[in-house]
Amino acid sequence: MFAKVTSLGLSGLAGYVVQVEADLSSGLPDSAVKESSERVRSAVKNLHYPWPSSRITINLAPADVRKTGPVYDLPLLVGLLAAQGVLPVPAPHQAFLGELGLDGTLRPVTGVLPMALAAVTLGVTELFLPAENAAEAAEAAGLTVYPARMASDVVRHLCGEEAITPAAPGGFDEAGTWLGPDMADVRGQAEARRALEIAAAGGHNLLLVGPPGTGKSMLAKRLPGILPPLTYEEALETSAIYSVAGLLPAGSGLLKERPFRSPHHSVSTAAMAGGGSTPRPGEVSLAHNGVLFLDELPEFSRDTLEVLRQPLEDGAVTVSRVHGTARYPCQFMLAAAMNPCKCGYLGHPTRECTCTPSAIEQYRRRISGPLLDRIDLHVEAMPVEYEALAAEAGGESSAAIRARVTAARKVQQERCTDLPGVRCNAQLPGAALRKYCRMTPKAQQILRAAFERLGYSARAYDRILRVARTIADLDGSEQVDTAHISEALQYRALDRKAM
């Protein structure tokens, strides 16, 4: 007696079909039963279905791909019951996912959204899974999702006794009014506010430098409120990563807000880039389409900071481990904050810095030149004057800034329709950069003079052009002129030869 049941697996965010094969043959039962089979055995008995008295052989194909976790409990149960003739053998277009409790309840599993999205392209049209996973799976167009709370619900459906009502797609609406921290709460800091707007409009990386208490963290935490809402495609990508990581809220569909990740400076390289015996997304991937905020940047270990270089450049990270390799997207905005020196008061108008020149240089060298090169905007946040703090009216609201940012992003997306995967100026490749960042002759002269005097790298040159293009977009200008280049140059204050 033999039965084959379709299930799904994941490699990174790529789904693939897993065939769960169950064969019952004459002979004594195998005593070497793994944990998953023990759960299935208990569930079968507690649901009062027969357990085979003969030898059971289970195969999960393809055999050369490592399969872990409890996701195959439900297809194992269905396969064993089908092999005994308790229920019809499911059709190949029907797939099954889910962990079994010992009493036969179905518990949610991770990675359902990317598996459901892949299932449609792999010929699967029906998916049976735990009810808590139904909302995310229903986002896959062309897939009928059957949510169940007990394994017995699935058995009765397959036997034609009691049909399961398919889950309805939740639909996707862009996030409405921002209810988080608002830029209107920020007093003063006009230059930093302007830099945040430019960073949000073009997707640029940002470094805030200033003494303690000047509002660097406060400003960074308001970045999500001025970023444009997630598009449907971005929401799918981001939600898929959170599904794999097990961070998608139970019973919810797609995420609607851009992620904001703020790991502690003690974070390991594996936690930052991704890792584990079975590769899992790290902080850089969890910040995909959102913001990765690193407060007290020099306090992070050198290895942890250096691991950011490749993700910042490529927008993707490959995690290699003994049991497999996974590739995750990580197109994020890096926002970082740091003190100007170890004591924190270099350049403070009223407090004296106690650091020696060599101590200041040593402190700043904790951030390597190549990493600093990849940060587009270097901004000073100085203490706010009393008049600004005491003023009744705050600054401009996040909603007003977001409207300008969204308009600038729309211009960029229309400009880049012929560039797959490019959504903002920060992602413009070299050839497109020269095409779309045409400068006036005077602007070229200013950039050339700065390049020769300060010794910018080729990477810094490209990033200055991208920032200038974003400033021009905010101004509604087709061409990059002297004002745009000059403002972009002022945000490179921490380049090594400019210090």
Q: Which residues does each PLM region occupy?
A:
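The Walker A (P-loop) glycine that initiates the GxxxxGKT/S ATP-binding motif of P-loop NTPases
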Residues: 210, 274, 296
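Walker A/P-loop
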Residues: 208-249, 314
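Catalytic P-loop NTPase motifs of RecA-like helicase/translocase cores
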Residues: 103, 294-301, 344
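P-loop NTPase nucleotide-binding/switch module
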Residues: 159-198, 202, 229-284
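Peripheral, non-AAA+ core regions of ATP-driven protein-machinery
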Residues: 1-207, 211, 217, 320, ...
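Walker B catalytic acidic pair
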Residues: 289, 295-296, 307
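Basic, amphipathic alpha-helical bundle interface domains used for macromolecular binding and assembly
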Residues: 28-37, 50-52, 59-69, 278-279, ...
